[in-house]
């Protein structure tokens, strides 16, 4: 699926992925190809993106929103965890 993770200032990840794990307002979810359409609030946690080469990318998130669209596309607007 196509995945984009954005802040208001920059692109944190953009590319193909096999899975995305994240914390939502209702608990932890894993988004895979052919996931049903969904809009949700993201809670504080670490987002894990597994790309097509099985490499894992970790993005600390303090808050945000996600949208999963039909057609295998997931977009995330996030606020990065302060370091």
State each model region's role.
Residues 2-83:
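Compact, glycine-rich, soluble single-domain proteins
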């Amino acid at each position: 699926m196509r995945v984009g993770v954005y802040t208001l200032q920059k692109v944190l990840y953009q590319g193909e992925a096999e899975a995305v794990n994240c914390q939502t307002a209702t608990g932890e979810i894993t988004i895979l190809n052919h996931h049903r359409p969904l809009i949700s609030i993201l809670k504080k946690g670490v987002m894990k993106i597994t790309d097509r080469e099985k490499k894992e990318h970790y993005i600390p998130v303090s808050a945000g929103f996600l949208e999963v669209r039909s057609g295998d596309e997931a977009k995330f607007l996030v606020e990065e965890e302060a370091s």
